[in-house]
Amino acid sequence: MTSGRVNPQFRLEDQGIEGLGNVYYNFMEPALIEAALKRGEGTLGNGGAFLVTTGKFTGRSPKDKHVVKTASVADSIWWDNNAAMTPEGFDALYDDMLAHMKGKDYFVQDLVGGADPAYSINVRMVTELAWHNLFIRHLLRRPAREDLNEFVADFTVINCPSFQADPAKHGCRSETVIAMNFDRKLILIGGTEYAGENKKSVFTLLNYMLPEKGVMPMHCSANHAVGNPVDTAVFFGLSGTGKTTLSADPARVLIGDDEHGWSDRGTFNFEGGCYAKTINLNPEAEPEIYATTTKFATVIENMVFDEETKELDFDDDSLTANMRCAYPLEYISNASVSALGGHPKNIIMLTCDAFGVLPPIARLTPAQAMYHFLSGFTSKVAGTERGVTEPQPTFSTCFGAPFMPRRPEVYGNLLRDKIARHGATCWLVNTGWTGGAYGVGSRMPIKATRALLTAALNGSLNNAEFRKDGNFGFDVPVSVPGVAEVLLDPRRTWDDQGAFDKQAAKLVQMFADNFEQYVPYIDEDVKAVAIG
């Protein structure tokens, strides 16, 4: 039996997916919550939020992500970073997954990736879990109901958490699998209930497709000045560095919190919702995000709550530090309806420095911006990936290596060209540790970070006095109104300044060692600013 609204010429049967139980097409939020409750997938929370846990997988599994190696993509995929799967292995995986799905009920959402119709793709999401359908309905963009009657997908994603892959048969690394086949326009996800795999699979897809159209795909959040979309800012950063928090600024219009494209027309959100970390979420520091946790249909993932009152515990990380909430963009009162912006006037590269060495903000030249973009230094924050329990310093090129199917210089050259053409000012912002490394120092105060960003975005910071950083060569402001001067000089925040010097030298060497891999592919001006 099928129910819901769907193109009668584009049902699952028309795609060769047959023998399922009930298929529910394009259910809206109330029906999806009703189905999820009936199936025992979660609990109804305050305000109508939906509370779920995801079992042993509470973060992404980047090592289980595979790209099918066919002739059409063999020369364009970055194989050092993307595990290959044979076409035969994928075909066997597909057949076995469909056999596993026989007789079971499935939920289908027909959605769009990309707010700019010139560059958007149609995505069909087929999920075993009703709440996954609700999640992706929030996170991607929803077509008008009447448009569903003629919807045809460019790509299809099938997510079946109860299916376990066979590494020997399918050519994957474990029972968990995310397999992308660009020739068959198909993505298969199995063996994990973590909802973030759904959205990141579509992000990876766009990251492969858009560079061929001259569009720079970015792992970033974005906002613009009220009434002035030309004054757009983008915030690059890995999970947990502050993209969602810092872009949700009551004084600016939110374009999106995680995935964007930069075309010749400007900036556009790939998504239609947000996926925010909720650990230690504070109603005073982050009122907009906090308010979404008690709104109807918000998905609350892996949060401890009181069984009787359903009150959420924002400080209990016993399930995971990677607790999250997913909600549609319109739940943020100052969100952009169009999800479009101008060419970035300011580019902020967020890093979470667990060494406690980097300043809270630094101004970058275009060459330095290219260097730091390719380096992608940050710390993996606890819980965001399987097995990460405390901050781990890492270099993740383009501030999103797990989602970049092409070689880093493809994205780096796009960024270089667009900065040169549109004259963006670039900043490096450290949201990590100050006064010492992780375990000794403390996290950078969010009020200080917000004050520095406000000064950068309104242009006043450009008028400040700057000093040249002796370790990294970038410009650091000496004083900024509303920010303690000592905070701007990391060495002064350490009790033992000799220990700081050793730590800084260690980080400089890490930068130098990591960047060796990019030297053959970069211009002389970037080589000239290389650290170490």
Swiss-Prot record:
Its EC number is 4.1.1.49. Substrate binds at R60, Y194, K200, R324. Its cofactor is Mn(2+). Signal peptide: none annotated. Pathway: Carbohydrate biosynthesis; gluconeogenesis. It comes from Ruegeria pomeroyi (strain ATCC 700808 / DSM 15171 / DSS-3). It comes from the Bacteria. This is Phosphoenolpyruvate carboxykinase (ATP).
